[in-house]
Amino acid sequence: MSLAGICRRHLVAVGILGASLVGAALWLHSLWIWRGFTEYRMERDRDIPTAVAVGPDGAVWFTIDFADAIGVLRQDRIQRIQKGSENFEPLGLAVDRDGSAWYTDGPSRLISRMSPDGAVASFALSTPVAKLARMAAAPDGAVWFAEESTYSFTRLKDGAFTRHAVSTPGIAPFGVAVDASGAVWGTLPRANRLVRISARGEIAEFEPPTRAAQLGDVAVAADGAVWFLEMQANKIGRFAKGQFTEFPVPTRSAGLTALAIALDGAVWFTELRGQRLGRLRDGVITEFPLPQGDARPFGIAVDGAGNVWYTDLSGGLGRLSTERARGR
């Protein structure tokens, strides 16, 4: 299935798990605890947590599909903050150095920023239709996002948009990340390309060894290595010093949807169909089955302490503890 197909097929409502006890699991109101996992269930049955990002203050932000709100978890309490318009496939989310959450709002043709106190500032796109994918915050205070409707990687800084069109006509971008030097990395799923945009705006493209791999999310490690998902090929890819390395995921047709890098260098990813989180460390992939039988892990982020956060399309926000994440 194509990247777009996976996103659209699974961004639909599924049932909320009823209150029950499973083994050593503990259910406390909307809190579920089991073997290093903690899951916070959504209070509204229709809420579908989608993208997730962690701020410098430890706040965990997440978008909610088919809702007019953004969610944030602080001190084990979820707040549902109204934003004024309903989300549809809210795939873009990033938290800047000041702790403000930036998010894409395709139906309203906006890029918006929500400050820690909930104040919203929005910046209108000039296109009649806006189809938007992933987003990343840059060290210089800019935010970048993949603008599928204009086939561009777009920068927003001080209220001004700058578009960098991809060289292959009609090919929509998806993943986006910014490295420490300010260079932007992105993915072109249908073209099977990894893209680099230099600080001067020069664009270079690189093709991984596996054909038709369908590159998805992308992230840059502290050592400068670029990591990305190969959704169709069911692999995790690495690009460093001009060379590609690919790591097959043990679970077949896992449904790779999101990627994040921990401070210790471990690469974390979600397996939507496999109902697992995956960790790639020192060339070895370890999988962590989620505690709920109907789990659909979609977004992923790692906080400064090493806790791994993920969204569950079945209606939850989850955390894998640092101790469990760094173990075995």
Where are these regions (language model features)?
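Conserved beta-strand positions in repeat-built beta-propeller and related beta-rich domains
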Residues: 60-66, 101-107, 143-149, 184-190, ...
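Blade-level signature of beta-propeller repeat domains, shared across WD40, Kelch, NHL, RCC1
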Residues: 296-328
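Beta-strand-rich domains and repeat architectures in extracellular enzymes and scaffolds
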Residues: 41-68
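N-terminal Sec-pathway targeting helices
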Residues: 2-21
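Beta-rich catalytic cores
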Residues: 48, 66, 89, 107, ...
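Residue-level detector of Asp-centered blade-edge/turn motifs that repeat once per structural unit
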Residues: 54-57, 95-98, 137-140, 178-181, ...
